[in-house]
Structure formats: structure tokens, C-alpha cells
Amino acid sequence: MTLKELVVGFGTQVRSLWMIGLHAFAKRETKMYPEEPVYLPPRYRGRIVLTRDPDGAERCVACNLCAVACPVGCISLQKAETEDGRWYPEFFRINFSRCIFCGMCEEACPTTALQLTPDFEMGEFRRQDLVYEKEDLLISGPGKYPDYNFYRMAGMAIDGKAKGEAENEAKPIDVKGLLP
């Protein structure tokens, strides 16, 4: 080993230590996730939830449109009916290990029962734990649309009253009378 090689080797060691010293106290680009919350865009599509009406009843009417719209087929449900004729899902199941969070189920839902939230912390150790049942999906609030009530907007037959006679219900419009 010559003196020149020794000086070059020593110089590279000093240069390396100098570069480490420069970058050791610089501002870090890496965000420390649990301590610093991650910025999520306003329209971020995360975990799917089932919401309730402002009255507290389930919004889902088990129309099966969400399951049909799902491109990967991860939604399954079974329709049941109450004594007053209202439909509800007897069971509602989403397999999040197959879900691609595309949001097509939310767009297809006529009652805004299915909504995508900005929650993304869904990691599990076992694949079976990613199958969510209705009890896991149902939240206590109305979600993004707090004032929307499907049965008030769409109407539902009430025993003993004709269309347009119920409280907060508009009179029916004769659409054929609107033609020129």
C-alpha cells in the first residue's frame, strides 16, 4: 500500500463522516405514522360502513344493488321483511380481503346506507378476520348525509292513508298532465 492510497482512503473516510454529520441534523422527510396523522384527501375511499337513519333505524333496504355493482363480488346479503313491510338485510357480509375499495357499492346504494370512510387501519393477521358481518359494519350515526331519510324521500305506503296525505309528504303529481 502506497502513501497515496493511504491518503485517499483516509480522505474518503473523513468525507463520509462529514456527509453523515450534515444529514444527521437535517429535517426528516419520513413521517412517523402513529404519532403524526397521515394526510388523507377529502374523497379518500377507506373502510366501508353501514349507516342508520336520523331516526336510528337501519338505512339498508337489502335491494342487492351493491352486491351487483361490486366488480369482485365481495358483498353478500339476504333480504328479510318486517311486519310493516320494510325490507332489511337479515345478514350483510363484506369480505375485505377481496375488496378493492373502488366505491362502486357506495354509488349504487339508493339509500346512502353504504359509505366509505377515511379509516384505513384494517390490518389483520388472519384472513378470516377480514370478513365483516353486519354487526361489525353498522355504525350508530348517519355518516356523510345526516338529514337524508330514504323512506321520507321515496315514500312508503302507510295503512289507512292515500298517497300525499301523510305528514311531510308532497301531493302526487300527474306526470301525464304535464305533457304538451
UniProtKB/Swiss-Prot annotation:
EC supergroup of this enzyme: translocase
Stored Gene3D superfamilies: 3.30.70.3270
Start and end residues of each 4Fe-4S ferredoxin-type domain: 48-80, 90-119
Catalytic reactions on record: a quinone + NADH + 5 H(+)(in) = a quinol + NAD(+) + 4 H(+)(out)
Binding residues annotated for [4Fe-4S] cluster 1, in chain numbering: C60, C63, C66, C109
Catalytic activity, EC: 7.1.1.-
Residue pairs linked by disulfide bridges in the UniProt entry: none
Localization terms from the record: Cell inner membrane
Topological type in the membrane: Peripheral membrane protein
InterPro entries according to UniProt: 4Fe4S_Fe-S-bd, 4Fe4S_Fe_S_CS, NADH_quinone_OxRdtase_chainI
A biological process term (GO) from this entry: aerobic respiration
Entry GO terms, CC: plasma membrane
NCBIfam families hit by this protein: NuoI, PRK05888.1-1
HAMAP family: NDH1_NuoI
UniProt function note: NDH-1 shuttles electrons from NADH, via FMN and iron-sulfur (Fe-S) centers, to quinones in the respiratory chain. The immediate electron acceptor for the enzyme in this species is believed to be ubiquinone. Couples the redox reaction to proton translocation (for every two electrons transferred, four hydrogen ions are translocated across the cytoplasmic membrane), and thus conserves the redox energy in a proton gradient.
UniProt protein name: NADH-quinone oxidoreductase subunit I
Organism encoding this protein: Edwardsiella ictaluri (strain 93-146)
